[in-house]
Amino acid sequence: MKKRKQASSDFTFAQLPHNRKEVFFDCLKLRFGTIVCCGLLLLLFLLPLITVEITYDIVNLNIYNSLIGGQMSETQATLYKNELQLYTSLAQIVCLCIFAVGLAGVARILRQLVWGEPIFFWVDFKRGIKQNAARFIAVFVICALVNVASVLCSTMIDEMPIVGYIPLGVLIFVAAPVALFVLSQSTIYTVGFSKAITNGLAFYGKRPWQTLLFTLLLVLVGLTRLAPISALKYTLLLLGTVFLLPMYIMAWMLVSCNVFDEVVNRENYPELYDKGVYRLDKQ
């Protein structure tokens, strides 16, 4: 039987996390295996979307080769690319709904993790899906539809440059930031969908630059589509999903908790204020 390691000294209050930055690194140090398991679950639910992206890359490469080989004109290639982008964005709606289900379960596990609460992995995963899957699906569908509008309008950029970029701007600077707060709210509070959106706008106004930073990190992931098709590209995507995505979600959960503490928790939800944090002045 494997002998368990024992600490050389008793655990003291000073070793507990005193702010949410310390909570993040404590979770990485002490519960890395749980975080990786969450990443593997996210990868499982993200596989349909990855499959769509691989198909997009292959078809796009075939269009490019046909254009270079003189088998189609530049006008035909542009038409095919526009159709490919539209069909891909429509397929992404279904794929994102599938991913939203898995994310709802994982988000609850990571919430328990940053709160320092006991984790019953599969029980919490199923409970998160039961409680939040519908809300998460609704959020992803709205963002995906804005993306479809962006793809449609991108075909008008040459004729109407400003109009062509409006949906993309709405997605990056309005829909996605508010959606991030709607998702984190839904993991913690019981609140109506319209109220969650209203709250999301208010929270976004409290921390605009932090929120935009997290949004732009998602945009950078989206820009990987511009990279040429290669085994390295998809290997990095798979590894990023398993290791970096759950860390991103955990970091956003902690940022959200800071905002919630500042705006609502101190007065309305004192039991949630500084949850998972052991301030030195509270000793």
Give residue ranges: language-model regions.
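Generic alpha-helical transmembrane segments
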Residues: 169-181
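Helix-coil boundary and N-terminal low-complexity module in membrane systems
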Residues: 1-151, 161-164, 178-180, 185-226, ...
